[in-house]
Amino acid sequence: MVNGSTQYLAHVGELSLKKGNRRQFEVQLERNLTLMLRSINPHVTVRAGRLYLSVPASFEAQTTAEQALSCLLGITGWAAATACPKTMEAITRCAHAEATLAAREGKRTFRIEARRADKRFCRTSSEIAREVGAVIHQSGALSVDLHYPDVVIFIEVREREAFLYGARRRGLRGLPCGVSGRGLLLLSGGIDSPVAGYRMLSRGMHIDCLYFHSYPYTPPEAQKKVEDLAKVLARYGLSTTLTVVSLTDIQKQLQTHAPAPSLTLLLRMCMMRIAEHVAREQRARCLITGESLAQVASQTLENLTVTSACTHLPIFRPLIGADKEDIIRTATEIGTYAISIRPYEDCCTLFAPKHPVLRPEVEEMQKQYQSLMLGPLLEDAFRTRKRTRIYGNYGVQESGE
């Protein structure tokens, strides 16, 4: 704590490897965390591979800061830290205070890990660790255990000051959201699409979301589920726009006039065409889906080829080769799984045929699609879309548009 503030130190991730764009990525990381914490007036700086965060020394501010750091893409780890002058006396004094606190909490053994980033400092990393460790050991506060210590005290001598910290929490890694453009996620209520969105967020892409419903055949609870999924994604991406489009009239037309085995695939073709219009309106440069090869009948190689041919935009499928158990594990980690398994059907499952087409030809499906004269219905669906802006939960409320 310095001058009534609490300090945090975070290790940045891949952006430290991006030589030419490094400063751009650092600025984006600073901006993202500042936006997450704008309700508590933070001070954020990224330099030399570290992110420095200072927030007011209140319980509410610290809780908000730690929630934000837990959702911040672009860092590999973070910790609450103590800053002190770059002298051995100050470093030793602060380290001894950390050891004394650990002893009061019932810890018995310790190890020092020191890193001298500023090579001008008067001691090497090993000398810092040895000298500070000797003082703590001789004081009787804790005993040395280099292999299985109860507590590790980290010391970093940086270019302006030194930092000491104990427990280090794992970061999400990846790239800062916003450095890789904008994409439109086709967000259903299932397990896969939120994970696909998170995967693209972790590669630095800002995502907006598109949800298709078929009210009254799909209940309002199904849309509420998707809204809750979008809120979770907004925690990692700062914000998202959720566009909701009704497919009710289109599905009625397909149910009446389309060949039964082609129903799901024709519906997917309609979705892709509408999605392209929404994406261009929102300046998204790609579409994102949660499709995984051969996971269900509509995701055979041939079916994916047909839907890809319906848009001029690239379709990113980050889960295309993923195992279902791995997808579920990620969904659980990011907080979407419990929402996704709520028992409400989406529009794709309502009228799914018993024996869907598995090996369609692109030309044949395009002929079927064109014969249905769906253009006016697609235009109506796009025209009656509804949008909601959703923000991450860092003291900012969501607002409708």
Swiss-Prot record:
Keyword Metal-binding assigned to the entry: answer is: no
**SMART domains, sorted:** THUMP (SM00981)
Cellular localization per UniProt = Cytoplasm
- What Pfam families is this protein classified in? ThiI (PF02568), ThiI_fer (PF22025), THUMP (PF02926)
**What GO terms fall under cellular component here?**
cytosol
So what EC number does this one have?
A: 2.8.1.4
Q: Which pathway features in its UniProt record?
A: Cofactor biosynthesis; thiamine diphosphate biosynthesis
Annotated residues that bind ATP are located at 186-187, 211-212, 268, 290, 299
Location of the THUMP domain: 63-168
Annotated InterPro entries: Rossmann-like_a/b/a_fold, ThiI_AANH, ThiI_fer, ThiI_N, THUMP_dom, THUMP_ThiI, tRNA_STrfase, tRNA_sulfurtransferase_ThiI
**Keywords per UniProt:** ATP-binding, Cytoplasm, Nucleotide-binding, RNA-binding, Thiamine biosynthesis, Transferase, tRNA-binding
Q: How would you classify this enzyme at the top EC level? A: transferase
Q: What is this protein's function?
A: Catalyzes the ATP-dependent transfer of a sulfur to tRNA to produce 4-thiouridine in position 8 of tRNAs, which functions as a near-UV photosensor. Also catalyzes the transfer of sulfur to the sulfur carrier protein ThiS, forming ThiS-thiocarboxylate. This is a step in the synthesis of thiazole, in the thiamine biosynthesis pathway. The sulfur is donated as persulfide by IscS.
* Family membership: Belongs to the ThiI family.
Its protein name is Probable tRNA sulfurtransferase
Q: Which organism is it from?
A: Treponema pallidum subsp. pallidum (strain SS14)
What's the name of its gene? Answer: thiI
